[in-house]
Amino acid sequence: MPFLGQDWRSPGWSWIKTEDGWKRCDPCSHEIRSEDNQYPVNHSIILNSGEEEIFNNDCEYAAKKRKKQHFGNDTAAHSFYREKWIYVHKESTKERHGYCTLGEAFNRLDFSSAIQDIRRFTYVVKLLQLIAKSQLTSLSGVAQKNYFNILDKIVQKVLDDHQNPRLIKDLLQDLSSTLCILVRGVGKSVLVGNINIWICRLETVLNWQEKLQNLQMTKQVNTGLTLSDLPLHMLNNILYRFSDGWDIVTLGQVTPTLYMLSEDRRLWKRLCQYHFAEKQFCRHLILSEKGHIEWKLMYFTLQKYYPTKEQYGDTLHFCRHCSILFWKDSGHPCTAADPDSCFTPVSPEHFIDLFKF
């Protein structure tokens, strides 16, 4: 049974119910006793009185040291698990001092395990890309270390499963550009850590880029159904579900049939209408020699000037009632009468803006 101590911020003590009433549980005392009782030895048989006193003192010191190590391991085990949400406060209060930083949120929201979820992968990569472009130097030393550890896991994941390599190449390109500017302009901005650390990071990113550049897609030996075996209307349906033009171009390079379907004007027209407004079409109208609108060229031209709509399988959410940022699947301890009405999806750009003070 947990009991709240004098300090309201403490985790409290653990109590167990016995025949004599409630007693405070000491987890390490049972472990130490069990270790001492495993090999009972009568030390008085082999030691005299003077040596026995020295032996007892050594045993007492060893027991205290073992007890201290046990408490240290227990504390580390408790701190290892953290809630996957964070309270976003922008000013000091009576209970909370300071404010929540981008680095603190980055450390607390468990992005390391989020990259293993295919629904969150694109979201996390986009967030890392935005941080690489403008917020890298605002992270604390611990957050920067966590950032590059997560990036290392992402690169290894792509090298292993061969999924989303183009997405990671774009991220590493932006990151290497930022690191080059920081290293060349040393002294112009405040860098956390020694300059040699940043040079080492740049070399690591360049090494990642080289590995991804040399990535060879292994041909899978599969006797089952393939894309070529599907009817045309199903292949067309697959293409219409893509929201990224580069994915359509890449898929069109697989077979001549898919290339023919990927060049369909109606497909690119629908993609342009999904991402861009009609006013934007008029400003960058591209016509063919026959007077038809080149929707494919229009898409890639408009992409240079305007942001495209982004779709994510799962995103972070912000609770307006509790001011808590959290993953929707993990939830958070909400006290609102109707929690769902207080939740707002947080885009990667909005996530960055939350911590601009």
Swiss-Prot record:
This protein's pathway: Protein modification; protein ubiquitination
Location(s) in or outside the cell: Nucleus
Stretches the record annotates as Interaction with beta-actin: 1-83
Keyword Nucleus: yes
Residues covered by the F-box domain: 224-271
Keywords (A to Z) from UniProt: Nucleus, Ubl conjugation pathway
GO BP term, example: protein ubiquitination
Gene Ontology CC terms, in alphabetical order: cytoplasm; nucleus; SCF ubiquitin ligase complex
Subunit architecture: Part of a SCF (SKP1-cullin-F-box) protein ligase complex consisting of FBXO25, SKP1, CUL1 and RBX1. Interacts directly with SKP1 and CUL1. Interacts (via C-terminus) with actin (via N-terminus).
Function description: Substrate-recognition component of the SCF (SKP1-CUL1-F-box protein)-type E3 ubiquitin ligase complex. May play a role in accumulation of expanded polyglutamine (polyQ) protein huntingtin (HTT).
UniProt comment concerning the protein's domains: The F-box is necessary for the interaction with SKP1.
Name used for this protein in its record: F-box only protein 25
